């Protein structure tokens, strides 16, 4: 059977459910697919809880993560939805960016209110740069009808306070309450299917269409450099974001002092291009640049769009022994290599006050100082390597210098 072509007529967004264990994240995912299949039909297919729960394992940057991907659509948009079974899987997924989320649905039980992982997931969402969070207060059916409104109001206040604490707009965040279980059963009272449709409406209206990589400023990590006699120096790599046109000025950033040059030609598969865009593997001919003035690990970028830095705060997940990581903990002043885009740079890790050591399997906030600067922005992902093997994965949470 021929593969169905992906329909691009609707804007596409990546969303994920986050929240404390047993607050109903997977049930909500099942309820969304089931409710939309009934209410809208179209391409929506109901997916049962147990189909989502036995999530296939995938490897992202060498780390095994169990994630379940579902898809559904509203009248306005197509969504890819990721749900992870275990708390550790959420941490790894968010830090490695295995599924980059354009928005997260935070699930909070009406009977418990915010719990430790609720906080941890909100903090992680903030640290790794999830731009929007909306909230579903679940298990409303577990509250006595006469107490329901009052209890939900209290939980809602707590959640808004938490969101504000971690710099999300807690006062304006849409919060919908209902029961994922009731919706799954086809219940048509306000806490059943209508609550799910209300949540979808909040997702459609509160979260704007994301800027896609093509709209962002041009950036290409340099993979290789060679010189063509009589033509000059060519830098090759895959365009990470944006568009590059012939005669555009670019900066060469990272490792050494920043320089400027002009792209006088673009080739792909030995054909000349007028312009290259995100996803293209190209060779860029650089005016007046000598082969020894540019190296793998630098980036070509639109002037002024990104700067080189050495010091940053990071959110890091350290692999367990079983995942191929270290067998022993590391301590302050640990000096591994940090792999950014196309190259390793040595850096020194400083642990937070009161943390003596970091064990395999931990996730930890630490500060890093690299020996040479790398073009970076908040949200940039990296791997931590030692002797050529990956021992951790991280994301730049804050640039300090």
Curated annotation (Swiss-Prot):
It catalyses: GTP + H2O = GDP + phosphate + H(+). The keyword Cell division does not apply. Keywords: Cytoplasm, Elongation factor, GTP-binding, Hydrolase, Magnesium, Metal-binding, Nucleotide-binding, Protein biosynthesis. It is found in: Cytoplasm. It comes from the Bacteria. GO terms for molecular function: GTP binding; GTPase activity; translation elongation factor activity. Residues 138-141 are annotated as: G4. One of its GO terms (cellular component) is cytosol. It is an enzyme of class 3 (hydrolase). Belongs to the TRAFAC class translation factor GTPase superfamily. Classic translation factor GTPase family. EF-Tu/EF-1A subfamily. NCBIfam families: EF-Tu (TIGR00485), PRK00049.1 (NF000766), PRK12735.1 (NF009372), PRK12736.1 (NF009373), small_GTP (TIGR00231). This is Elongation factor Tu. It comes from Leptospira interrogans serogroup Icterohaemorrhagiae serovar copenhageni (strain Fiocruz L1-130).
